[in-house]
UniProtKB/Swiss-Prot annotation:
Primary location: cytoplasm
Stated family: Belongs to the SCAB family.
Any single Gene Ontology cellular-component annotation: cytoplasm
Name of encoding gene: SCAB1
Organism encoding this protein: Arabidopsis thaliana (Mouse-ear cress)
Keywords from the named record: Actin-binding, Coiled coil, Cytoplasm, Cytoskeleton
Outcome of swapping L91A: No effect on actin-binding activity
Tissue expression summary: Expressed in roots, stems, leaves, flowers, siliques and guard cells.
Gene3D superfamilies in the cross-refs: 2.30.29.140, 2.60.40.2700, ATP synthase delta/epsilon subunit, C-terminal domain
The protein, known as: Stomatal closure-related actin-binding protein 1
Amino acid sequence: MTRVTRDFRDSLQRDGVPAVSADVKFASSRFPNYRIGANDQIFDVKDDPKVMSMKEVVARETAQLMDQQKRLSVRDLAHKFEKGLAAAAKLSEEAKLKEATSLEKHVLLKKLRDALESLRGRVAGRNKDDVEEAIAMVEALAVQLTQREGELFIEKAEVKKLASFLKQASEDAKKLVDEERAFARAEIESARAAVQRVEEALREHEQMSRASGKQDMEDLMKEVQEARRIKMLHQPSRVMDMEYELRALRNQLAEKSKHFLQLQKKLAMCRKSEENISLVYEIDGTEALGSCLRVRPCSNDAPDLSKCTIQWYRSSSDGSKKELISGATKSVYAPEPFDVGRVLHADIIYDGHSLSLSTVGKIDPAAGLGSYVEALVRKHDVDFNVVVTQMSGEDHTSESIHLFHVGKMRIKLCKGKTVIAKEYYSSAMQLCGVRGGGNAAAQALYWQAKKGVSFVIAFESERERNAAIMLARRFACDCNVTLAGPEDRTETGQSP
């Protein structure tokens, strides 16, 4: 039997942790944290500014895990589940080994305690105390071992639970992979079928396009051949013949209209001669828009027109309202769009006598002018080539070409890239035909852009002059502005 000596206690005291004095003061209430770096170097956590708090570390790792989970496919998840299942099985094996080792430790502790118990009965004195202290330590180790076994049992249960969970997850992942694979195959098949249908539709469309193209080409060739045949049969073409006939009819109509006006004037003269009224002057000219009306003497005894005072008026067809035309004081007056459908009068004062002349009928509109203006309205902005004859009352000798721009919101007069005048439609703006007489009165208009700035502008033809007036008044009316001449009454300012 082995003899226990007093050195057993001394060895226990040497192996024990020496006591800490009560007078010791620690700098912190917890054990300091350290970090082991490369080459087993120890770093203090407080001295490292790059070390993050536990909350930040958890947040960063959580974000990384979320990103990684988003990137992982179903196959990768299944692979990781299988790895986790293998790890769980390995942990289960390690738990079994730990359990066997724990049983061996219990047997050893029991044998050691029995040996110490038998030894306690054989020794006395100080050795007995040492044996009892050793028995207490063995019992404490047994308690710690029991606690450790409990913890191992709990860990074993958790490992089993985790293993079953991972196994179920692995099966679910495999099932999900199979379902996704089947779904992907079905999608691929449907996509192939759709592509095949599209290809077939494209082939049919190409075939139909080729067939229709050939048919269209044949029809076009037939039309070209028919057109060539008609062209060969009609020399000159019927269109040119119709144009010549239409032009001749217009000339005949104009001559008959002029002859009709002459007959009406002769009839009026006959009536006045029967009433013992001798006509000294008369209004000569075509009573239509685009012409010039002139006051001319009817006899050689008539006073010279330069010594007479003349004033032109416009009135309704029944003569109830008579409106003075401001500035129309010459023997020549060119009707403007305001005069269409009205009767024009000329009051003449000579040698203390007063004479009033009037047109035989109402002023007729110009043929085709309305449709021409409607076509210009659809363009929104129209430019006319003009020549400026007067600027603010002074004669302008230059005959250079200017551009008269009539827009939806404003009127502009330009010479090349230089803007001479540009004004929006307003109540201060005036626009009408020229009222000062002259041989080209039917082709000229008067435009007052604003107070103190006015122009007399000559157009290339009577049609363009009247179209510009009607177009500007149309756009101004859309802006709630009435464009008229000087001292014209606004209630009559309606374009025909």
